[in-house]
Amino acid sequence: MFDIQIFLILRSLNESARFMLLLEELIIDSDGDMPIGSGIVAGFDDDKNFAVVLDYTDYETGYNRKTWAVVEKEDALAMADYLKVRLTSLPKEILERFGDWSDIAVPSEVEAVFKDILDFMISCGVRYQLKSNR
């Protein structure tokens, strides 16, 4: 019983400490009933850079890793021009191209989608910088 309470507290704390991006779109999320969760969001950070974020959490151990692919403002504008969409529509564009609402993905599938998004951004001719909290 005690282990379950700790698990639920850690899971709640982790979810409440989640960051927010401006115009954030949830691209894909793994099955919420699994002990390991993973998801991808896209949006704009506080510096108005376009960001795609992979969030990986092992709820049993409390391990959490976030990996950001950050596209600077100028490159994000070039990407929007290339895709013929407004800059503010980039998160929705990524959602439309890579979104998965089935909620049955496993973390490895989520990571594969993140790689596909990175490859797509390169194919649009933009550079990104990878950042991680680990």
Language-model region placement:
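N-terminal amphipathic/basic-hydrophobic helices that include classical n-h-c signal peptides
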Residues: 1-20
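Intrinsically disordered, low-complexity segments enriched in polar/charged residues with Gly/Pro
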Residues: 13-14, 26-31, 107
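Charged, low-complexity, helix/coiled-coil-prone segments
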Residues: 14-15, 19-26, 56-62
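Amphipathic, interaction-prone secondary-structure segments
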Residues: 19-50
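A short, structured beta-strand/loop element
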Residues: 48-73
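Mixed-charge, Lys/Arg-enriched low-complexity segments
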Residues: 64-134
